[in-house]
Amino acid sequence: VLFGPDALEYRLQDSTASLVITDQAGLPNITAIRAHCPALKFVIAVDSQGIDTLDWHDSLHNEPTTFSAVSTQKSDPALLIYTSGTTGSPKGALMPQSALLGNLTGFVASQNWFPHDGDVFWSPADWAWTGGLMDALLPALYFGKPIVASRARFSAELAFSLMEKYSVTNSFLFPTALKIMMKAVPSPRQHYQLKLRAIMSAGEAVGDTVFNWTQSALGVTVNEMFGQTEANYIVGNSAAKWPARAGSMGRPYPGHRVAVINDDGQPVNAGETGEVALNRNDSHGHPDPVIFLGYWNN
């Protein structure tokens, strides 16, 4: 379970969500906080039963087999994803319908021009987090490629076993996960038959040691990526298309206009320090599709 009762209560109260879908592992936390969330009217439980809950399978069975899709605009709200709260309480970032399509150029590049025939995706990133959702699950499904799911607690042995068993070709692995794998199984190809062809890594700096290990031990050059909940997949590497270096965050992914600027908003020269800035308009002059609509209730 990614969130405990307090974290769930905060998000449900702030978002005024009226419906929750949960499973057996998450239901006790929802039950414990339900009285504190007045907007929450319905709880749908998957493979579990509780007081005042609806059964997922029954609810699905009672729905009509045909429906009319709702017409939406690219700037209409699609997702409310809460940040990790690095600088205070988590903030609800309201994402537009265009966010997934905007992510795809970076996803394709960071996964060495995904998809190829036979590609299979796996990542330990939780699908409730923007990284697991927008950098793994939804892009893989968009391209009609299988993605492996596992509820087991992460370990190096689990990672290598899953990748071997399901012939995983592409993955999103945090630098911390790669460090754990490197320490536990220094020479993985001596023990596992792997088919990895691309790894994207984000969330923190990869570092020289991990970068060099993935090349030598896994036969893959890790593609480091930079993004955040509010504007994802904007800068990174693609070893299949341009040289990737340890310690380099890469280049702007296709379509995005990115610069390093000073306090006056002007681009700095090579070798100078500044802030990474994403232009609100893409390289075609249109609003960049990955940029969030705003913070919920703020």
Could you say what each language-model-derived stretch is?
Residues 1-5, 10-19, 119-120, 138-148, ...:
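A short helix-loop-beta submotif of the ANL/AMP-binding
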